[in-house]
Amino acid sequence: SWMHTFGVLDAIVCPSGGSPSAFLARNCCPATHILRRAVWEQCGGYDESMRSGFEDWEFFLSMLETMPEGYIGIVESPLIDYRTAPASSNVTSMAKRLELMPFIIEKHMTSYQNYVMDAILGIEASSVARLYGWESEMMHAIKAEQELSQESIAFMEHPTYGDGGMAAAVRIASLHDRGPWKKDDLEQMSNAEI
C-alpha cells in the first residue's frame, strides 16, 4: 500500500508496484506486503546474504522472475505507518546504493538483459524528474533572491553534460537579466545579493 511516514518526514509515499520490468529501475513496493506462501517458496524467499539493504527489492525481483506475467499491485491508500529517522536503514542503504546495485544486477542479469530499455528509461525518468525539481527550486531561490548552496553554485560553474544538466543551467541562467553569468555573479548569489 501507500505509506504514511512520520518522524523526520511527514508525507504520503506512493509506490507504484508493477511488472518485472518496472522493478529493474527501482523498488516499487514497500517491504510490508501480502503474498501466498507458495510464491515465497517458489522464489526461495529473501537472500539472507543481503544485510546492508535492498533485500526486499531483490526479493520482489526474484518473485517476479518466477512469474513472468506477474504483477505486484499496490493498495492506493496509506495503510502503512513508517517511522523515518536520519539513521534508519532505508536512509543509510541509499548511501550504499552504488555498492549494492552490482549484486542485484548480477543476480538478475537475465531480467536486466531482457528489459534493458525499460530499466534504463525507468532510471532516466527518475533522474529527469529530480533534475526538474532541483531546477524549479533554483529558479524559485533566484527569483526570491535567496542564498544558493555551494553545491548549486558549483553546478552552475560546471554543469554536467549529456544528462540534461547543461540545459537546466541554461534555463536557470536565463533568469539572469544582466547577460551571461560570470563567476562573480554566482559568488554574489551565495551571499544572497542577486
Predicted features and spans:
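A short, conserved acidic/glycine-rich loop-to-beta-strand motif
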Residues: 1-3
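Conserved nucleotide-sugar donor-binding catalytic segment
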Residues: 5-104
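C-terminal, non-catalytic tails of nucleotide-sugar-dependent glycosyltransferases
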Residues: 29, 34, 69-72, 87-189
